[in-house]
Amino acid sequence: MLTNKLSASRRVYTAVMRALLLLAAVLTAALVVFMIVYVLYKGLPYVTWHLISTKPSYITGAIGILPDICNTVQILLASLLIVLPLGVGAAVYLTEYAQSKKLVAAIEYAAETLSGIPSIIYGLVGMLFFCEFLGMQTSLLAGALTLVIMNLPTVLRTTQESLRTVPQSYREGAFGLGAGKWRVVRTVVLPGCIDGIVTGCILSAGRILGESAALLFTAGFAHTLNKFVIGLASPGATLTVALYAYAKEEGEFDVAFAIAAILMILTLLINLAAGIVGKQIQKRSQQ
């Protein structure tokens, strides 16, 4: 009798917990879908070719975000080209080569600490160090380097966790065939954890696209169309900074929602592209 009561109470408890977990999952998905649909509903009607292909003019009052799109792409590419080799290289060293456990623990603790620092503090430090101390002034390069420091812990930790999922037997089998350490890392370990590297890239790209506080101090507000690569030495506003400026300073909420919709579309395209590239790399490594 007692056993039946315990079994019944456990079934009730399991059913209640399952219902609560399902409710939490549904609410989370609903909130995400609502936010995406709402932003696209409010913003897409104002996304026009004229908006994305022209420069703003304070003389004529014309509104355009072409410089902001170009500046965003430049900062995104510059940041990823620096942070990915640094983060992946550091993760490989700490996981595959480092002998001192204290060193590994210290670096991991530092990375965890850095990932919790507010972005506005990164912006202040970037302004003082890159803009003032190194003499870069307010520029896209200073903003990109600040974002590198912000995203380095993310790439480092995601790559580390992915490297640790590669079975040790894979390494031992490669060593048994006479492969050296670097060859094992390059041909066995890295292809086996490409999903984690792609995840780190996606997370970093999303944070770079959505960052504004750090760039306000380092890259500036200027809606100027800078030349590719050479223009990294010049100031420029990104899409998120432009969104803030149009919504807060100028009261152009329609333009702000249009920029938000463009940012969502860019994030989706980056996620799709990163997933495709990751699958192609995996296929080539398995051939």
Show where each model-derived region lies:
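Transmembrane alpha-helices
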Residues: 80, 158-159, 181-219
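Generic hydrophobic transmembrane alpha-helix motif, especially the helices
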Residues: 112-150
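Periplasmic/extracellular loop-to-transmembrane helix junction in inner-membrane transport proteins
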Residues: 2-20, 37-79, 100, 245-254
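Transmembrane alpha-helical segments of polytopic membrane transport and secretion proteins
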Residues: 1-25, 274-287
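C-terminal transmembrane helix and the adjacent membrane-cytosol boundary/short C-terminal tail
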Residues: 94, 160, 164, 202, ...
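Amphipathic cytosolic juxtamembrane alpha-helices at the membrane-cytosol interface
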Residues: 14, 99-103, 171-199
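Interhelical loop and adjacent transmembrane-helix boundary motif
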Residues: 56-63, 215-264
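Transmembrane-helix boundary motif in ABC transporter permease subunits
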Residues: 79-111, 124, 274-283
